[in-house]
Amino acid sequence: MTFEFAKRPTIKGYPELRWTGKRPYESTQYYPAQLREQYGETINGWINKIFWGDNLQVMSHLLKDYRGKIDLIYIDPPFDSKADYKKKIEVKGVGKTQTDTNSFEEKQYGDIWTNDEYLQFMYERLVLLKELLSDTGSIFLHCDDSRNFYLRCLLSEIFGEENFRNEIIWKRSTATGLATKRCGTLHDTIYWYSKTENYYFEMQYHEYEEDYLKRARKDENGRMYIPIPTGNPGPRPNLYYEYKGYLPHANGYKWTREKMEELDRQGRLIFPESPDGRIQYKQYLDEMKGTKLQDIWLDVYPVNPVAKERNGYPTQKSEALLERIIKMCSPQNGLVL
């Protein structure tokens, strides 16, 4: 069984990443794959699955049943960090002496590549992942500063720059003293692309930061609120009008005159003392879920050495990080790879 891939049309002036030995990846064969493990109880005929083997062959295997059906993909590929990653394996029943230990290190994978090998490796897998993704699906690619600039070019070439959604900065570690002649590296990068413009998204929130809460005020009923501008973020000439002697921002108000009058009756407007000032709006804290999630994630911590979820894998990512991504871009009962 052969699977053919639709080739993205060549657009004049559209950038494309080139490297020595770049080979088009326009089809693949169906491969049998080894279903290694299953987790949980069957739900509507589905059970969580883990495949072991070369991921290119496993994805080719998945095309038969899941082409265009996967709602969310998260990948944490090799970073080309020029290092070998090892996991400490405990040996039961072996006591420590001065000359031996009760554990040994097992190599998990080597992350040392030449440029052309690495780029071809990632290119072929991203093409396959696009084929697996549903039209409302998203892909999140986790990387660091080793090759992130190349990976973004590849993602834009395959998924289209118009489907780029965010470059997420995740603070993965605390300060380190390893860097002596440059700034220390504290973050990873997560690129988010969608398959189309019609992608699933559920806004996520996090707790209010202390600096934000310092701006809060209390109304006559004891409710806490934040004063926010009433100006429109974009030019709206039809919403530019005077209200009770006060002019809006140059873009106009956010709301129609009728809506402003309704907010005024509710006591939601704050009028300035100066005639040249601008009206503000009371945004009550108890009406909001928190602060809307932005593209810098400082509140999701890496797996600490004594965490229950830690399995010893050298580049393990936290469950909290994956939970946030899944809640944000996978519908209920969605299919996640």
Predicted regions mapped to residue ranges:
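Core catalytic lobe of class I
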Residues: M1-L337
